[in-house]
UniProtKB/Swiss-Prot annotation:
Protein name: C-type lectin domain family 4 member K
Impact after mutating residue 313 to A: Loss of binding to 6'-sulfo-LacNAc and 6-sulfo-GlcNAc
Residue numbers on the Extracellular membrane side: 65-328
Subunit text: Homotrimer.
Membrane-spanning residues: 44-64
Entry GO MF terms: carbohydrate binding; D-mannose binding; pattern recognition receptor activity
Intrachain disulfide bonds: 223-319, 295-311
PANTHER family (UniProt xref): MANNOSE, PHOSPHOLIPASE, LECTIN RECEPTOR RELATED (PTHR22803)
Organism listed in the record: Homo sapiens (Human)
Expression by tissue: Exclusively expressed by Langerhans cells. Expressed in astrocytoma and malignant ependymoma, but not in normal brain tissues.
Membrane topology: Single-pass type II membrane protein
Amino acid sequence: MTVEKEAPDAHFTVDKQNISLWPREPPPKSGPSLVPGKTPTVRAALICLTLVLVASVLLQAVLYPRFMGTISDVKTNVQLLKGRVDNISTLDSEIKKNSDGMEAAGVQIQMVNESLGYVRSQFLKLKTSVEKANAQIQILTRSWEEVSTLNAQIPELKSDLEKASALNTKIRALQGSLENMSKLLKRQNDILQVVSQGWKYFKGNFYYFSLIPKTWYSAEQFCVSRNSHLTSVTSESEQEFLYKTAGGLIYWIGLTKAGMEGDWSWVDDTPFNKVQSVRFWIPGEPNNAGNNEHCGNIKAPSLQAWNDAPCDKTFLFICKRPYVPSEP
C-alpha cells in the first residue's frame, strides 16, 4: 500500500515501512551556461532556485518533526491495521469454524426439534393418560366415599339383617304351620267329602257299614266297586272301633280261608297276625261247624267278637279303604 502527500517543494512517500523525501524535480546542476547571452536570466533563476531550496530546507526543518509524528501515527495505525488484519484472519478462521459448527448445530437443532416433536407427542399421550387416570381417580374416590357410607351403614344393616333373619325364621315357621294347616284342612275336607257319602273315618282309613245284608262274596264285590275291600283288623283299637260301631249287629269282615283246613287271611292282602288275632275270636271260635264256615264276621260287642260262618249266608258288611289325599 502506497500513500503520497504533497509539500510545497518536496515529495513524501510511505511504502510499507520505508520512508523517502525528495523534491519533485532535482535542482539544476551548476556549471557554465549552455545558452550564451542569457547569463543574467540564468543567474536570476539560480538565485530563485537557491531561495526555493533554502525555503524547502527551512520548511523541511520545520515540518519534519510534524511529518515524523505523522509517520509515527501512521506506523501505529499500520500496526493497528495489521493487528486488525490478523484479527480479521483469525476471525475469518473462527467464522469458518463457527460456520461448520453452525451447520453441525443446525443438524443438532433439527435432531433436537425431532426429539422435541417426539417428546411433545409423548407428552400429549402422557397428558391424556393423566387425564384418564384423574377421571378414574375421581370415580374411585366417589366409589370409596360410597363404600365408606355403606361401611357406616353396616352396623345398622347388620341389625336389620338380624331382625329380618329372625322375621324370616318366624315367617318360615308360620309358612310351615300354614302348610300343615292347609294340608290338615285339605285332609279334613277330603274326609268330610267321603264321610258325606256314608263312610266313617278312623286313624287314616274309611269304613263303610252297609245297610243291606249280602253274602261274603257279594259284599266283597260291592266293596271293590267302591275302591275298597272287606275290612281287615290290625290293632286292638281298630277292633274296638269296629265292634262299638257295629252296635251288636253281625257284619262280615275280610276274614277268609282257602280249603277245608286252610289258614285264615285278609282279603285285602294285609298280613294275618295269627298270634295277635287269638285275642279277637269269640272263645271256642273258629270251630268250622258243619265244615263249611270259611268266612269271618264280627258278632259280639267286645274285643272277642270274631266268629266263623258259612260264606253264603247274608249279613251286613264293613268295607275299608285307606285315606288317599286328593289332587291339588
